[in-house]
Amino acid sequence: MLVPARGVEQILVLGSGISVSSDAIQMADDLGVEVVFASYYGKPLARLIPASLGGTVRTRREQYYAYNDSRGTDLACSFVRGKLKNQASLLKSFAKKWKGQKEDLWREFRANSSRIEELIPRLDLIKGQVELVRGEIMGVEGMGAEIYWRTWARLIPDDWGFPGRDYPAARDQINSLLNFGYYVLEQEVWAATLYAGLDPYAGFLHADRPGKEKLVYDMMEEFRPLVVDRVVVSLAKEMRPGHFQDDCRMTKDGIKIASSAFYGRLDESITYREKRQILRNIIRSQASAAATFLRGERPCYEPFTPRW
């Protein structure tokens, strides 16, 4: 299949034994297209970044300064606030389907959605340098995660034997799907931070670790429920045990199905801020919004929280 070069936003080289010509890499650089090399199961291994995406000095300088002032804490709280709101929204969206039919599930999902939302005001009370208050912020996120994953598990057919969210290893098929989806989301957020001129390694919510893109992990948080978790619920009904190997990694056919679903989700359009927008573009807009906040060009960072 031929694809117009100017219509390509990212090249993903998945698996081993695949070569990319130097001419193709040169063209990708000229067009500002990132080339990502990933394992057969989607885990990123290396990236070729176009020279033009090095970022502006001012944006990155302000990003580093923000770690030691209120902006760092504001951003970290905003990322968690967005995640909690979207977790609650996802549970509410599934609860609607059961109203009048499965009242016990409807009440359970509505109640737990409200419990997650009730955690959000706690973030408004957290002040101070992010290094000192990170534990408080992550504590709020953790309380929400406990409620969310326990409830979300009810959406997965019993046949899969989903044991709950497993960090970071995947010893079952559903966690394998979640991890694969997060790898896909990670590539998209990584590209968005580069286009916005940000340093993907200098985060706020997640503590620094050599070689880990902590700002990417930060900015993924608000998108996880609606870009990945929602898709996995659908895949759990579409896929079969035969799409997985004995070690719970997907087969080639399984990867094709999962890839199509996750990338298809990124290309979906939703109503956000009173207009139809593609999710992939919203991710880039959010990265740009974070950059403008850090530069002092907007008073706050508003996380992605669409209405359902």
Language-model-derived ranges and their functions:
Residues 5-19:
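Extracellular/luminal Protease-associated
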